[in-house]
């Protein structure tokens, strides 16, 4: 998540984008989490928001595609959900869309001896984002972002 999708995640994204969009939803992103029981998590959104029926419709459609294509060699659970208040960020477009909002980042490789950063999204330039952290601008490569989420404020 955040940038630098795995080869499997790229392949899955290519396979399921069209079916998700055909149902009228935006494919926000996907995560494939390997474990004893692996999980394929799909995040969807729409202008009207997402409810349980929307998730069920997408799950049914995506399951049919995955059953035919069979891209995942291990047993897994399929989860479809809205991005929620702490919306995950996957693409440069997501960062641009939420410019001015607060984001929490976990990096693949430390920058200045830190892997965790939190600040305001200031700018997006190609595959680089600028985040203002404690009054100072820090630049991160999307490919170095392991996980990124908006920080909700109540």
Curated annotation (Swiss-Prot):
SUPFAM superfamilies: YhbC-like, C-terminal domain, YhbC-like, N-terminal domain. It is found in: Cytoplasm. One of its GO terms (biological process) is translation. The keyword Cell division does not apply. The keyword Metal-binding does not apply. Its main location: cytoplasm. PANTHER family: RIBOSOME MATURATION FACTOR RIMP (PTHR33867:SF1). NCBIfam families: PRK00092.1-1 (NF000927). This is Ribosome maturation factor RimP. The lineage of its organism: Bacteria, Pseudomonadati, Pseudomonadota, Gammaproteobacteria, Enterobacterales.
């Amino acid at each position: 998540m955040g940038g630098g999708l795995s080869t499997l995640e790229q392949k899955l994204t290519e396979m399921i984008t069209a079916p998700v969009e055909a149902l009228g939803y935006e494919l926000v992103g996907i995560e494939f989490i390997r474990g004893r029981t692996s999980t394929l998590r799909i995040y969807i959104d729409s202008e009207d928001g997402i409810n349980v029926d929307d998730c069920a419709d997408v799950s049914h459609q995506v399951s049919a595609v995955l059953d035919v294509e069979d891209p995942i060699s291990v047993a897994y659970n399929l989860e479809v959900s809205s991005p929620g208040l702490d919306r995950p960020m996957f693409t440069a477009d997501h960062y641009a869309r939420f410019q001015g909002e607060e984001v929490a980042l976990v990096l693949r490789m430390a920058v200045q001896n830190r892997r965790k950063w939190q600040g305001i999204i200031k700018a997006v330039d190609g595959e680089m984002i600028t985040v203002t952290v404690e009054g100072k601008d820090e630049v991160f490569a999307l490919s170095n972002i392991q996980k990124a989420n908006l920080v909700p404020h109540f």
